[in-house]
Amino acid sequence: MTILSQVFSIFAKSYWYRKIMKKVIYNKIDKRILSTLPPVNFTGKIIVIQGEQEAEKAVEYLMQQEILGVDTETRPSFSKGVTHKVSLLQVASRDICFLFRLNMIGLPDCLIRLLENNYIPMIGLSWNDDLLALRKRKEFKPGHFIDLQKIVGAIGIEDLSLQKLYANVFGEKISKRQRLSNWDHEVLNDKQKTYAAIDAWACIQLYEEIARLITTNDYHFEMIVESGSI
């Protein structure tokens, strides 16, 4: 049996586990499966922040939340030796995502205060890379950050990308088409805004669901074995 047919067979069985028994979690998701999944539907509110006064109000709201999802975007470089500073900081609650346009406002004191806080868990993915990029704009002491890549192994998941993690846990696909778009553009288009918001918001969804599964053991684990590894 090929790896793809094996995966499709397991996915077919998983329907009944999801409906009748437990959620099915796989050690890894074959990338060819991703195209068969429905897209993520983000219904939350997206607010673009382009001024310091707006940033102050946004941070005031965010500092009252129980949990936050975080991510960054940087304008891609297609020339050797050319790099750009981080363009966008996304910070999401469960139903609102703020897009802070750092290329316009830098890292104001209110954002530093948020990033240094030690009591609101801020969930990210491969967050050390984001922190390095942010600290190139302005130095700060990172607060209470939790990296999803460090906890997914607790339920047997080997994949580390956000797209594959979300597909595994929720059976939906996060599109990555906007990743290499121009994040320094004067006006972000709707597709960019939705993409950026989903990446931060999805971190909360994943963290809370993985924490639930760890606590309740309410899942069925399936091992995908690659061809030639047996």
Which ranges hold each PLM region?
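Conserved DEDDh/DEDDy metal-dependent 3′-5′ exonuclease domain
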Residues: I47-Q50, E54, M63-I67, P76-K176, ...
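N-terminal accessory regions of nucleic-acid-interacting proteins
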Residues: V7-L68, L148, W201, R212-F221, ...
